[in-house]
């Protein structure tokens, strides 16, 4: 839907290419792409995720994402008839059941993973089932359906937050490129969408891109910091790195914070 709306608004979407060079001369930005083409723009927005190449190009001093010590496993399963909302099971191995349609749900499982191990794709379904061996009986029963290695999505949880500037010259960062959060409060995509709204507003009213970028960062930093740090506190509490956090209370507070104007 977002892609269709962008095209309808006049955007040109090019797939299968990446920026090989970003050169800001103060009057505009020249971008050379991996297919050999080159174009010039008024500004560049790096919305390219936690491993942002744009961030590395304009702020090599920004560092890299930090591994939290926890990972998440995901798998789609048939939805039980009585599952009509998110069901969460807390503990060192956390489990969530999330309805997706009248027929399907997905299960997510958070586990402590010291040392950031890697799991081979062959046998990863068995590994996920084994992670659930000490959970509640109903979860162990559902785990019997985790059989397809290709269906398992495993991700180490990493985080980062730029406490300084979010832009350099005519190039600005957005979303996970500047404030990557763990999923414990479910606000990663929401923060990126809010970023885009605020950035558009500030570009429309500012005299220069630099002024717009500074105002955008000023409006966004505290809320994004709150989400990143609060999510990480839940994560660390679950794996014993810090005191446990009351997930229900943290989620209630998050809804109150995110209901405020941006």
Feature annotation, model-predicted:
Residues 222, 249-252:
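Compositionally biased, low-complexity intrinsically disordered regions
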Residues 144-147:
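Conserved, helical-rich catalytic subdomain that frames metal- and/or nucleotide-binding sites
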Residues 234-242, 254-255:
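Short alpha-helical linear motifs
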Residues 251-262:
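C-terminal auxiliary extensions adjacent to catalytic cores
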Residues 45-46, 128, 151-237:
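Conserved mid-domain beta->alpha element of the FAD-binding
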Residues 56-59, 186, 240:
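Short amphipathic alpha-helical segments
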Residues 243-248:
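C-terminal domain-tail junction helix/linker
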Residues 1-141, 163:
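Conserved FAD-binding catalytic core of PHBH/FMO-like flavoproteins
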């Amino acid at each position: 839907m977002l892609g269709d709306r962008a095209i309808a608004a006049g955007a040109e979407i090019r797939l299968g290419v990446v920026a090989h060079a970003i050169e800001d001369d103060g009057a505009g930005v020249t971008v050379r792409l991996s297919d050999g083409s080159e174009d010039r723009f008024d500004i560049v927005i790096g919305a390219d995720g936690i491993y942002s190449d744009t961030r590395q190009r304009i702020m090599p001093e920004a560092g890299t994402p930090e591994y939290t010590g926890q990972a998440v496993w995901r798998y789609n399963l048939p939805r039980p008839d009585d599952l009509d909302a998110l069901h969460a099971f807390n503990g060192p191995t956390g489990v969530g059941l999330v309805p997706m349609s009248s027929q399907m749900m997905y299960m997510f499982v958070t586990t402590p993973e010291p040392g950031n191990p890697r799991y081979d794709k062959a046998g990863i379904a068995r590994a996920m089932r084994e992670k659930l061996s000490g959970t509640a009986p109903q979860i162990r029963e559902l785990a019997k359906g985790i059989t397809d290695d290709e269906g398992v999505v495993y991700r180490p949880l990493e985080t980062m937050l730029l406490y300084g500037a979010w832009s350099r010259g005519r190039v600005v960062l957005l979303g996970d490129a500047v404030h990557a959060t763990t999923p414990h409060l479910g606000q990663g995509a929401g923060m990126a969408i809010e970023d885009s709204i605020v950035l558009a507003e500030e570009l429309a009213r500012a005299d220069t891109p630099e002024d717009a970028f500074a105002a955008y960062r000023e409006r966004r930093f505290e809320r994004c910091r709150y989400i990143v740090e609060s999510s990480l506190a839940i994560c660390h509490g679950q794996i014993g790195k810090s005191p446990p956090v009351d997930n229900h209370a943290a989620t209630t507070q998050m809804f109150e914070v995110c209901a405020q104007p941006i």
